[in-house]
């Protein structure tokens, strides 16, 4: 099911970039005319492509997180080199075939695959590269940012990095909406989304009731073959993620109270993949590292708070600022939007507390350690990131 959305969103991202270029008439804007005696002047702002743009995409949405930046870069007039994650190269290969079949000339798009430590590093270090978009982990993104900035001049770097995404629940919330939205965001795609809900802060008066409902819904989630539409969780992507889940679970068993999950599945069909149970942990000390660290597996920690101000302080007390959700009274939502430090924010959304992005509806991007550009993918300001401005001033004798 996630793959169906990934492909559909890719098509819409490509259409959206094209529509923004057309709606803005190529981003050529006539400016003021200088008041020069005896002369006529004109000034025009134009946006021009940078040249060669690199797109490095992650495994979790290999179509949309390749096609989105690739499409924007191409529409802006750049040539593109794109390298997928080593776990999911075939999806990007299919995108390359679609571009070929659409008639885009050879050399305008260039699909390459290989390890990030060798091929990826060589691309980043190439002086022929004029800009880069990387979607992935904070640590790798920051290394790319530093390495890419060590050339002869400053080159644009668009980073879409991780998240440690909170949901805040007020005592005035619709608790069923909150429970459904939190579970969907925490465990969709096995928690392997940068937008996954990994932290929940609940006001004390509704804490017990809501936690009970979250656990109840979590226990109903089907785990198995991800091609079966009745299944909600498939396996995590690889052995490293499997080991991460086991290490985090062991830590939580020692330092928190696990209400459900906290173990891998080994019997029967589960022996054929990296299957993990969706995990809810409570009573984790506020200073514990797992409140800060992006886990990227199906684990969510929940805390009781005395009031919304405490919840907001804890929600913002991380290096990340990607997505965030809130459940409460309508009059409380402005407070949430005004104070939360995140690029994509949701209020009273049962479809997902912290997840859900679509071009032209919920453009996707982060603040702080979650993103570098300040402009969200699939939004009205995104395609411009792949161009630089040039001013044309022309003066004629009157």
Task: For each feature predicted by the language model, list its residue ranges.
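Residue-level detector of anion-binding/catalytic polar loops
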Residues: 79, 257-258, 321
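Catalytic cores of nucleotide-enabled group-transfer and carboxylate-activating enzymes in metabolic
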Residues: 4-5, 13-16, 362
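Conserved C-terminal structural/oligomerization subdomain of aldehyde/semialdehyde dehydrogenase
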Residues: 104, 128-129, 168, 222-226, ...
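ALDH superfamily catalytic-core signature
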Residues: 103, 125, 131, 139-285, ...
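Rossmann-like NAD(P) dinucleotide-binding subdomain of oxidoreductase/dehydrogenase enzymes
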Residues: 13-15, 23-177, 305, 373
